[in-house]
Amino acid sequence: MVTVEEVRRAQRAEGPATVMAIGTATPPNCVDQSTYPDYYFRITNSEHKTELKEKFQRMCDKSMIKKRYMYLTEEILKENPNVCAYMAPSLDARQDMVVVEVPKLGKEAATKAIKEWGQPKSKITHLVFCTTSGVDMPGADYQLTKLLGLRPSVKRLMMYQQGCFAGGTVLRLAKDLAENNKGARVLVVCSEITAVTFRGPSDAHLDSLVGQALFGDGAAAIIVGSDPIPEVEKPLFELVSAAQTILPDSDGAIDGHLREVGLTFHLLKDVPGLISKNIEKSLNEAFQPLNITDWNSLFWIAHPGGPAILDQVELKLALKPEKLRATRHVLSEYGNMSSACVLFILDEMRKSSAKKGLKTTGEGLDWGVLFGFGPGLTVETVVLHSVST
């Protein structure tokens, strides 16, 4: 007789979960941040709010963002005036858009990741789909399974309404799936479209305006599995450990609420302070087993919630400016794409490391950290090990 323990042992993979491919995608419509305030106040019929527009201009100027990509074009917004109001019933119109577009953009990113992976898509055993943009049944995971032509027996997990920390969450889940299911190949997709959060300006709610200055659309996909097949699968990063925590005294710091008017976004002023005050504790807990205490010896992938968060983290940990280069680059080129951001940064890091001829995928360094921050305040901390280039 075979024992349960023997069955269990046979089910487990040998090595750590490994990122084997990364793909990214954005909608074609690109928005220039320097001219965005003019466009935004015009399309929302708010040009008479001159003081508010000046404030928004300053927000955009300070955002460290050059451009963003958005599914919402001028034509779409003109057809949906309620989406342009600050608080008008518009959920149906928004849902009609994202239910179709979120899986579609996810497919674009997933197709690129699968191509780089180089294996037939029939070998994908699990799908993790994550979006903060709308909800539906059957979910975006089901729609993507159909769009890609994955096997009907693929094991799906749908994550809705997580927020900006979820790029870390999906890596944590993919790690557990890959390491506990021998031969598993997990397709992870984060797809975000701001059609749920876009709204006109309000004098009384400047936090909503902050979101309008920062958020952009994008999708990222990765393939994760343990024990890469030599000569066939190319490892990029190993997922060594993953943790999640709720920061103390942070209730209500970042909230989102799905209402008739779409997804409303609420932000307290001291989010950068709350994150920077608590980040060292998360780092110590994550890196104590590795005896690492020099944060400049790591490569860094941090969710770029906004420039103030990055500045304060840099200051608190005395990080050298180049540590957050990849993070700031993605913020500058795409804005805050919620859960997809950290996967875009992983992609940027391995590409720039290869381009510069560095010895590892992690800017020539062995160990790295990936941080996700979002509603809660929830923090995801993932310890990464790079791979020789």
Swiss-Prot record:
Signal peptide boundaries: none
Pathway the protein contributes to: Secondary metabolite biosynthesis; flavonoid biosynthesis
Keyword terms: Acyltransferase, Flavonoid biosynthesis, Transferase
Keyword Glycoprotein: no
EC number: 2.3.1.74
Any GO MF annotation of the entry: naringenin-chalcone synthase activity
Single biological process term from Gene Ontology: flavonoid biosynthetic process
Location of the active site: C164
PROSITE patterns registered for this protein in UniProt: CHALCONE_SYNTH (PS00441)
Reactions it catalyzes: (E)-4-coumaroyl-CoA + 3 malonyl-CoA + 3 H(+) = 2',4,4',6'-tetrahydroxychalcone + 3 CO2 + 4 CoA
Known role: The primary product of this enzyme is 4,2',4',6'-tetrahydroxychalcone (also termed naringenin-chalcone or chalcone) which can under specific conditions spontaneously isomerize into naringenin.
PANTHER family: CHALCONE SYNTHASE 1, HYDROXYMETHYLGLUTARYL-COA SYNTHASE
Family listed: Belongs to the thiolase-like superfamily. Chalcone/stilbene synthases family.
Protein's name in the database: Chalcone synthase 2
